[in-house]
């Protein structure tokens, strides 16, 4: 809309009317949007009187032209003399107050004027304030309230279901279809003094479906809180319950249950005169410091509900039904608690009444040794192991433990947190690291190999070791690091966990590269599974056994995707079989003899069993002529049956592989020590491994005349390597010839025995 003047014809001449007439003109979409935004802004701003130009703080933005005929241009906002500077700096405000002599009380008003000018000038970014719901900060308020009262969250109990106790239940009447559970947490200290904490009442439906809509003032979820002394001195923690329900009396008809149901009929039926109350008791051990039992975080569990009239011992403990004041007296006796708790260890409880509940902790009792934790002291940060084991840092060592760290510590002791480990030793056991080699080799005496006459199976002597067996504890050390971003003259001490690693691959860190750098993030995968399963990434380590290439200080970092023999059932079955059956080779088959096939001899029991199966064999197909009666053959050989036919057995072929087996022993020993093998890697790496092998075992190779086997191994690897080059062949071969020449020179210097 644009304003225009209306022309009126008066006395033959035209004159312009003073009142403007708005003529509708076309506007673009963007112009209309800008006009709407401007109108909204004008509506949101408070209207203030602008009688004079000097007193106005801003200019009106309404697009209405004045009816005045003066030709003076309109006054702009920036040309108006400002009463206050448009800056909210505290120093300028202070100078302004001193300059004009304003009182101190006006500082607040002056700052408001500054903020208002910045707000109207669109220099402030205003956001709508979102009020948080009470559910977001209610847990924090609850925790603060517990801290003010000296309480600590112990565990959370949720009573879920009652099984095998639903007799005489009518789902239409809530009195019989629900049970009331009164739970208690009983704490026993070192002096066998009992502290009983009541948890309130829970209502549990007897059927799977929910109860009718009745207003219960109880909840099935109970948050147990304890004070600091109770939490520190707890030796045993029991959970005791008293479950009550009602059943209709025998021999009496329930009033008002037939015909049309009314409110009066339900009230009459629910009266205590028509029902009898049943009471059951139960108790279970949740925590025991001495026996290292911790069931506070075991999830879903059950408590066997006992009837006082089931056994005379129960009647003596719980008292008679006409003595309700003695229902809680048994909780103060430690022997009664132990006796009732032992009934929960019965596994055949499918026919017994039981209460199903779940338990969850707040990480206070994740270690069995609760006595080490004092709630009155600030909780230190926990150290998480790479295997998923959490160990609390120790404080001090009360006894001398100089040589205790060198003792062998099993993973079971580390997981259970045994009390035999003192504080200093526990502080050392803060992390596990992998131990090389990943596979073990059975100890074999190479020198006495040719003197043996029995069969020695060496093919499967290299067995895989799981991660839990090749994990060793390492202790933390104090290191000094200097941060690069801050120039510090005195180095900042930061206590971290470092490896006591040397050049040996057995003590190298899993994320340490040959150059001493560490791999983090996706370059090195940490343990993410549950304990004690450990994930490993096999990387090329700093290894003296594998020489570096010429002109290189550090070798190339390569990821080794090796596959080790795991879960090899055939290998273990062979080992177990050879442990029981010992064979002796004939002289013509010993070590350097001809190829020989040996049959494992059968025992008399196996032969009799085989003949028995043949004698009772039934032929179901009558079209086939049945077997003839087995003739009696006076056979004295165990390898033949009654008919004189050989009985099938196991056999094994032996080749003249004396030198081959000895060479394999040397290779396996080297691969296990170096942690590498020249299998499926680059040609450069294969060449370096072969060079390291001849460097270490050249004395055995030349003494046992295994030269041809090493040369054959080089040629074989060269044939199966597509990227094999002349340089890769010359690296081990030149070293082999050099060592052979030195060995021959030493042999010449040795005087002959003749």
Curated annotation (Swiss-Prot):
Tissue-wise expression: In adults, it is predominantly expressed in the germline, and weakly expressed in intestinal cells.
Induction of synthesis: Repressed by GLD-1, which associates with the 3'-UTR of the mRNA and prevents its translation.
Intracellular or extracellular location(s): Nucleus
Annotated region (Disordered), positions in chain: 1-83
A biological process term (GO) from this entry: regulation of gene expression
Predominant location category: nucleus
GO CC terms in record: nucleosome; nucleus; PcG protein complex
Residue ranges, compositional bias (Basic and acidic residues): 31-40
Keywords linked to the UniProt accession: Developmental protein, Nucleus, Repressor, Transcription, Transcription regulation
Disruption phenotype: RNAi-mediated knockdown results in ectopic expression of the homeobox protein egl-5 in the head region. This ectopic expression of egl-5 in the head region is enhanced in a nfya-1 bp4 mutant background.
UniProt biased composition (Low complexity): 51-61
Entry function: Component of a Polycomb group (PcG) complex. PcG proteins act by forming multiprotein complexes, which are required to maintain the transcriptionally repressive state of homeotic genes throughout development. In association with the nfya-1-NF-Y complex, may play a role in repressing the expression of the homeobox protein egl-5 in tissues such as the head. PcG proteins are not required to initiate repression, but to maintain it during later stages of development. The mes-2/mes-3/mes-6 complex may participate in the global inactivation of the X chromosomes in germline cells.
Complex and partners: Forms a heterotrimeric complex with the Polycomb proteins mes-2 and mes-3. Does not interact with mes-4. Interacts with nyfa-1.
Protein name per its UniProtKB record: Polycomb protein mes-3
Protein encoded by which gene: mes-3
């Amino acid at each position: 809309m644009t304003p225009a003047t209306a022309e009126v014809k008066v006395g033959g001449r035209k004159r312009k009317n003073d009142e403007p007439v708005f003529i509708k003109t076309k506007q673009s979409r963007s112009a209309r949007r800008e006009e709407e935004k401007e109108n909204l802004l004008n509506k949101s701003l408070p209207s203030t009187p602008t009688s004079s130009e000097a007193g106005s703080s801003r200019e009106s933005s309404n697009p209405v032209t004045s009816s005045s005929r003066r030709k003076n241009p309109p006054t702009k906002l920036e040309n108006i003399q400002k009463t206050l500077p448009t800056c909210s700096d505290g120093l300028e405000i202070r100078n302004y107050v001193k300059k004009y002599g304003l009182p101190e009380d006006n500082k607040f008003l002056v700052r408001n004027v500054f903020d208002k000018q910045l707000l109207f000038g669109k220099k402030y970014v205003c956001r709508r304030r979102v009020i948080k719901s009470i559910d977001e900060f209610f847990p924090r308020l609850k925790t603060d309230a517990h801290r003010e009262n000296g309480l600590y969250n112990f565990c959370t109990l949720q009573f879920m279901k009652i099984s095998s106790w639903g007799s005489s239940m009518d789902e239409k009447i809530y009195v019989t279809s629900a049970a009331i559970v009164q739970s208690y947490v009983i704490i026993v200290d070192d002096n066998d003094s009992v502290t009983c904490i009541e948890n309130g009442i829970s209502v549990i439906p007897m059927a799977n479906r929910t109860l009718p809509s009745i207003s219960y003032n109880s909840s099935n979820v109970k948050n147990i809180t304890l004070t600091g002394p109770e939490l520190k001195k707890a030796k045993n923690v029991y959970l005791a319950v008293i479950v009550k329900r009602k059943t209709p009396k025998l021999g009496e008809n329930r009033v008002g249950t037939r015909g049309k149901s009314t409110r009066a009929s339900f009230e009459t039926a629910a009266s205590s005169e028509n029902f009898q109350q049943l009471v059951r008791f139960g108790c279970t051990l949740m925590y025991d410091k001495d026996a290292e039992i911790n069931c506070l975080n075991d999830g879903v569990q059950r408590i066997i509900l006992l009837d006082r009239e089931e056994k005379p011992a129960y009647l003596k403990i719980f008292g008679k039904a006409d003595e309700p004041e003695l229902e809680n007296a048994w909780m103060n006796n430690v022997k009664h608690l132990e006796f009732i708790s032992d009934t929960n260890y019965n596994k055949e409880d499918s026919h017994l009444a039981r209460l199903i509940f779940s338990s969850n902790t707040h990480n206070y009792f994740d270690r069995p040794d609760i006595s080490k934790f004092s709630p009155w002291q600030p909780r230190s940060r926990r150290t998480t192991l790479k295997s998923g084991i959490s160990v609390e840092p120790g404080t001090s060592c009360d006894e001398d433990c100089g040589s205790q760290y060198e003792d062998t510590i099993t993973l079971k002791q580390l997981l259970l947190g045994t009390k035999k480990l003192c504080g200093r030793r526990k502080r050392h056991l803060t992390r596990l690291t992998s131990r090389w080699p990943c596979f073990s080799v059975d100890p074999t005496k190479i020198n006495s190999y040719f003197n043996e006459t029995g069969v020695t199976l060496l093919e499967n002597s290299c067995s895989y070791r799981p991660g839990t067996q090749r994990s060793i504890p390492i202790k933390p050390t104090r290191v000094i690091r200097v941060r690069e971003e801050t120039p510090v003259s005195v180095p900042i001490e930061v206590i971290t966990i470092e490896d006591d690693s040397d050049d040996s691959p057995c003590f190298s860190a899993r994320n340490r590269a040959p150059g001493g750098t560490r791999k983090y993030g996706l370059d090195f995968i940490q343990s993410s599974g549950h304990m004690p399963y450990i994930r490993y990434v096999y990387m090329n380590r700093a290894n003296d056994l594998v020489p570096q290439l010429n002109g290189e200080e550090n070798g190339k970092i390569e990821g080794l995707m090796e596959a080790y023999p795991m879960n090899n059932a055939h290998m273990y079955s062979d080992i177990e079989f050879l442990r029981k059956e010992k064979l002796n080779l004939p002289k013509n088959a010993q070590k350097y003899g001809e190829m020989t096939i040996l049959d494992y001899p059968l025992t008399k029991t196996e032969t009799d069993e085989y003949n028995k199966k043949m004698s009772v064999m039934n032929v179901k197909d009558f079209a086939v002529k049945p077997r003839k009666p087995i003739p009696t053959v006076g056979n004295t050989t165990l390898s033949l049956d009654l008919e004189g036919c050989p009985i099938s057995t196991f056999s094994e072929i032996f080749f003249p592989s004396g030198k081959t087996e000895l060479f394999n022993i040397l290779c396996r020993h080297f691969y296990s020590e170096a942690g590498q093998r020249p299998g499926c890697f680059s040609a450069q790496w294969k060449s370096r491994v072969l060079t390291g092998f001849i460097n270490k075992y050249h004395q055995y190779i030349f003494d046992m005349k295994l030269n041809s086997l090493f040369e054959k191994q080089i040629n074989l690897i060269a044939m199966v390597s597509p990227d094999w080059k002349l340089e890769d062949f010359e690296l081990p071969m030149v070293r082999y010839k050099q060592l052979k020449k030195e060995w021959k020179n030493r042999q010449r210097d040795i005087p002959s025995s003749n």
